[in-house]
Amino acid sequence: MNMRRFIILCLLLFASLAAQARSYRAEDIPNVQRADRTRYVSNPDGILSPGAVARIDSVCGALRDRAIAQVAVVAVDDIAGGDVFDFAVDLFTQWGVGRAENDNGLGILLVKDRREIRFVTGGGLEG
């Protein structure tokens, strides 16, 4: 009887851990810029510390104020299928990162479970 309870407990634990891991589609990731123009980091899974988010927001704000670049940073546990770079291009295109007249957008996507970071740059930053 005790072994049966132990096995059931283990199965419940593994099921709850699996349920916590979330794979995002591009349209599911919260765009923090819509709620607060001084925020540039979307960190729905809490991968980055609050201090890191605050520092990145500060640097991104300075880049935007100087009209150097408009930056968006996303850190998630995993994405739903596909290539990370293609996902990043789709995500940051949907969000409209960068000014159209100078194409100065920079999107940075960190996908923890795949151990990948992808940078998507507008043509104005490449030259």
Question: Which residues does each predicted region cover?
Answer:
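Helix-centric, low-specificity signal for extended rod-like, repetitive segments
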Residues: 1, 13-15, 105
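Hydrophobic h-region of N-terminal signal peptides that target proteins for export
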Residues: 8-20
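Folded, non-transmembrane soluble domains that reside on the lumenal/extracytoplasmic side of membranes
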Residues: 22-127
